[in-house]
């Protein structure tokens, strides 16, 4: 939990409820959207928490609640965790709130507007440090009108004055800007990889805006995602690289098996699972293995039956 990525993920909603419509892509017509907001561990590529909201609520409205949830889970010490976000989170009110009230540091791109591009060109040349061919960085103080005093990291690409291109980032703390810009921030794209690989399990579309139903449906999908993530770790290529749809179609739907009850244990037997030896070493005699890890093997939502597997 030392590097986190926060990102909104909006999906088409088919709710009958009257709600504000939203244009998600340029050139498309407004449609009903269900909003979800996520925090992912950018190193493990796995979700920490999420929340959902109607299109009436903005990123500025929802993100403080989301970060409170992440803080209650991770309980980071000040300066221990860095949150990377997109330019939609560039708000003085939001940045100040997270900086002052939580233990998270924040790194946010500054929107590519003319006023900002002009300010980058006015930075003296001696404040830029050439890192390698075509890449230089500068670290300068930055004050927001509705926020506090922070740091602005500016990256400059190009070798000649006519070719210079700039991109600015706001950091709530003084840190190494090269690591932040070339190592930390690019990991934010793991959020998109997570959505692309797993959204078929429950967050590709929304059929209702009832919050109880939405939270239950998405939470159940995340339980499935966590189980499949562990399964991928025990499958060799190409299975380990397949997205959720591919796994469902060409792995799960093609496995034969049966389910039996033996005493207080539900036994699931698979007959043609790939990498059976690796799966057998991990999942057979599962109740005994859980007890060795001080985990109770009874499953509450299976009427406290234990769950075990066999591979033939």
Map each language-model feature to its residues.
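Active-site-proximal, Lys/Arg-enriched surface segment
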Residues: 1-40
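Short, conserved catalytic/metal-binding motifs centered on acidic residues
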Residues: 2-11, 45, 80-90, 106, ...
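Flexible loop/turn segments at secondary-structure boundaries
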Residues: 12-14, 57-58, 89-93, 114-117, ...
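Electropositive, glycine- and tryptophan-enriched low-complexity nucleic-acid-binding patches
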Residues: 26-75
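Domain-level cores of phosphate- or acyl-group-handling catalytic modules
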Residues: 57-115
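An anionic, glycine-rich sequence signature occurring as long contiguous blocks
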Residues: 96, 100-200, 288-312
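A short, flexible helix-boundary coil/loop motif
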Residues: 133-135, 224-312
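Short, solvent-exposed helix-loop connector elements
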Residues: 177-184, 200-215, 232-243
């Amino acid at each position: 939990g030392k590097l986190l990525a926060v990102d909104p993920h909006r999906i088409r909603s088919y709710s009958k409820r009257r709600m504000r419509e939203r244009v998600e892509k340029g050139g498309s017509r407004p449609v009903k959207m269900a909003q979800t907001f996520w925090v992912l561990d950018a190193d493990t590529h796995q979700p920490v928490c999420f929340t959902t909201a109607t299109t009436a609520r903005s990123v500025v409205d929802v993100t403080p609640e989301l970060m409170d949830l992440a803080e209650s889970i991770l309980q980071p010490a000040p300066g221990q965790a860095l949150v990377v976000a997109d330019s939609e989170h560039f708000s003085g009110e939001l940045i100040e709130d997270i900086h002052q009230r939580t233990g998270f540091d924040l790194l946010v791109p500054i929107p590519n507007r003319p006023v900002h591009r002009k300010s980058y060109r006015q930075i003296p040349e001696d404040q830029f440090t050439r890192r390698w061919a075509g890449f230089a960085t500068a670290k300068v103080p930055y004050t927001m009108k509705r926020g506090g005093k922070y740091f602005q990291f500016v990256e400059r690409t190009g070798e000649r004055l006519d070719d210079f291109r700039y991109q600015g980032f706001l950091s709530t703390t003084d840190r190494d800007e090269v690591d932040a810009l070339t190592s930390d921030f690019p990991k934010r794209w793991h959020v998109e990889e997570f959505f692309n690989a797993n959204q078929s399990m429950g967050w590709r579309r929304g059929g209702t805006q009832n919050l109880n139903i939405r939270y239950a449906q998405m939470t159940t999908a995340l339980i499935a995602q966590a189980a499949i993530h562990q399964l991928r770790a025990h499958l060799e290529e190409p299975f380990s690289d397949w997205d959720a749809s591919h796994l469902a179609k060409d792995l799960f739907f093609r496995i034969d098996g049966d389910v039996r009850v033996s005493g207080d244990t539900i036994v699931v037997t698979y007959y043609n699972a790939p990498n059976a030896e690796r799966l057998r070493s991990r999942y057979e005699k599962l109740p005994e293995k859980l007890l060795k890890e001080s985990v109770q093997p009874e499953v509450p939502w299976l009427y406290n039956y234990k769950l075990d597997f066999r591979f033939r």
